[in-house]
Amino acid sequence: ASKNLEDKSGGRSGTIATIARNPEQSKHLETARMNVLGHEVDFVNLRSEMYAEDSRIPEIQIGTPLEDALRRDITINALFYNVHTRSQEDLTERGLPDLREGIARTPLAPLQTFQDDPLRVLRCIRFSSRFGFEIAEETGSAMQEQSIQDALVRKIKRERVGEELLKMLKGKSPLLSLTTIEKYGIYDTVFGVPPDVAGKTTGTQRAQSTGIHAASILCSFLDSVPTSLPAPHTELLKQAHEDHGLRQRLIFGAALTPWRDMTYPQKKGYLPVVEHNVKEGLKIGSQNHFIPSVPRLFAAHKRASKPSLDKFEGPSQRALIGLLLRDGDVHNPRTGTHWSTSLLFSMVQDLVDLIDDQNTLDDVQAQRIVQIYNVFVNRVLELDLVKSIEEPPRLNGKEIGAVLGIKPGKEIGIYMDHVIRWQLEHPNESVDLCKTWLKELHQSPANGDSGAATPPAKRARV
């Protein structure tokens, strides 16, 4: 093939790589890989599979074209293209009709093929969502069988479940993927916590529908879908539109809404169950900032829920709002957390709380919630706070120590908090004026003999 390509096109195909056999990972036959016109192409034998009852890793042997087609997850993926006759070959006799009619169907009896490899359940959902296909009735019924859901838990490593979910989130219709997962009763199977963790949790799990509601509201905002609600401030949407990875994290976080009020014990105290969902339940971890940014979306909601301006009354409204926006749960570029999307997610959570048991949103209160956030963002812009969110302290720890004549330690951190609050109150003042103010604060009678100032509130509790 390599030589023929070079003879026909005059181009180079590059080196031919061999992917070795690895029976422990279901690689019983070698694969050759070659670059063809800038695309990596795998050359493989036709294969047949034999499954053991307790494993999804099959024994693979060289097979016939029909055997190879039947082992595919859905019929449209079982289509062949014959390079000699330049024609399509539909050995299952269902692939082309299903492609025309928009149906996702398994080539074999769905109950058996899902028992053999339960991951095919998620692949079927992913492809149906990607192409906007309907899942065949018998295929959907098999997905709902308890034996299949048990097999999905027993046979499939959580990393593989997480990989399939990430592909859904990166696809064109992540919301459709989530609603399909919920429709066929595998929401807890995909997102939930194992029994050994569930038995130790505190708090109450919300209905699965809250995850779908949250994702639906979020996607309607991100995609500018007309609803009865006012449009969110454009500043809340800008970052998510520019960063596709951030959009994925927001939708994933919305899907975890049912577990938002739950914690589980660890050696260092109680941790949010949503952190377990991401890190252990789906083994997604730190890739693309899913950890820690997804759990921090929920932490930010606790800090920023319904941020009406009357909650920021004080000597300096600019400082109070600025301290909230600088909070590490609300904004931290190193972890992929941005203040605008933290507020957007918080607004979505507040709106979900307004949906009653009949799945009806209180439109009057919902419009009020959106207006509160829009007014808040307008005030952030009026106060020119965006540039102050990531501004470093005017004085670092070493400079504070030199100005006040104190040694490194906890006291430095206390004064650092004061410096940050001061610069939020006085955005245009000089470093020298900050030093003068800091000396006066340190020497003021209110500090007593120790010279240690009482730290300002690090966060605006709203």
Set out the residue ranges of the language-model regions:
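Catalytic cores of the polymerase beta-like nucleotidyltransferase superfamily
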Residues: 1-462
